[in-house]
């Protein structure tokens, strides 16, 4: 959960504190005043913070609250799912589904975007060792045929269906529910709120990053290992210089422009839907390692 810290004038804070105190209301005794004084003297726990153009915002880590509530009702297993790679110009969308073990939840789980690469790698290994998970890929060809949203939802659904144990409830990040054989709950900003979705976001991100490093060896010159296929200036320059590779998404505007420059006679290639579900383990994901 993200909250903007309100900038309240010092006098307003003092007035509010005075109204709230037992002494100000005239009904407090010395013990209450002493307890209030100790509570005021004790520093409050500091939430995680990040900087933005509007100042400092408090960021609470994801919790296991939703999963635990279902577990108490006898609804288990519960899976969280998320994807990585909607925005890039090259490479697949990678979707992951994770069922956490309530008794072996790795510490430090968070939205993959709020973690460093080193933190993601460390948590990825812990998730693989303690959780049930599956990964599915939507190829650039499928993205071209179905569009990025439909391809992403397809991959998320396939990842859930590939889990070693069928879940009874699924949490998915975003606004859209997916086609699964159980109740599906879409949670906007779920990778920062629901712990199992956060775990899935890490698995998807690390898997895709490793895959793009492997594709960089197959197609040198584009810098996939650096930008992971996103449309940064270095990637756009390489695309303009070399033209599209087989790993680029043919219908994304910068790729279309590069193809017109290098292959003005060529049609958009016919989609070759090679992307199938792949259930992976920690060692199998170590692509290019």
UniProtKB/Swiss-Prot annotation:
UniProt-annotated stretches for the region Disordered? 1-55
Residue ranges annotated as transmembrane are none
The protein's enzyme class: hydrolase
Primary location: cytoplasm
Which reaction(s) does its UniProt entry say it catalyses?
A: Endonucleolytic cleavage to 5'-phosphomonoester
**UniProt xrefs under PROSITE patterns:** RNASE_H_2
Q: Which residues form the RNase H type-2 domain?
A: 76-264
What name does UniProt use for this protein? Ribonuclease HII
Q: Which organism is it from?
A: Bradyrhizobium sp. (strain BTAi1 / ATCC BAA-1182)
Source species taxonomy? Bacteria, Pseudomonadati, Pseudomonadota, Alphaproteobacteria, Hyphomicrobiales
């Amino acid at each position: 959960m993200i909250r903007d810290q309100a900038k309240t004038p010092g006098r307003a804070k003092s007035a509010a504190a005075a109204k709230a105190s037992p002494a100000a209301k005239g009904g407090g005794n010395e013990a209450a005043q002493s307890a209030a004084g100790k509570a005021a003297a004790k520093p409050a726990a500091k939430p995680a913070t990040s900087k933005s153009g509007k100042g400092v915002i408090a960021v609470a880590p994801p919790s296991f609250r939703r999963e635990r509530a279902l577990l108490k009702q006898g609804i288990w297993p519960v899976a969280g799912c998320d994807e990585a790679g909607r925005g890039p110009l090259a490479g697949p969308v990678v979707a992951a589904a994770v069922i956490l073990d309530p008794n072996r939840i790795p510490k430090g789980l968070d939205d993959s975007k709020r973690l460093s690469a080193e933190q993601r790698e460390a948590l990825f290994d812990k998730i693989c060792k303690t959780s049930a998970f599956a990964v599915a890929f939507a190829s650039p060809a499928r993205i071209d045929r179905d569009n990025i949203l439909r391809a992403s939802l397809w991959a998320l659904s396939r990842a859930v269906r590939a889990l070693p144990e069928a879940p009874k409830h699924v949490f998915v990040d975003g606004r859209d529910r997916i086609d699964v054989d159980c109740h599906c709950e879409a949670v906007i900003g779920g990778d920062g709120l629901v712990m199992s979705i956060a775990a899935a976001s890490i698995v998807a991100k690390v898997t895709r990053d490793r895959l793009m490093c492997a594709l960089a060896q197959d197609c040198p010159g584009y810098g996939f290992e650096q930008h992971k296929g996103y449309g940064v200036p270095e990637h756009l320059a390489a695309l303009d210089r070399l033209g599209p590779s087989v790993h680029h998404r043919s219908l994304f505007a910068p790729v279309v422009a590069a193809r017109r420059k290098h292959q003005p006679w060529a049609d958009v290639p016919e989609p070759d839907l090679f992307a199938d579900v792949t259930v992976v383990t920690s060692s199998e994901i170590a692509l290019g390692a």
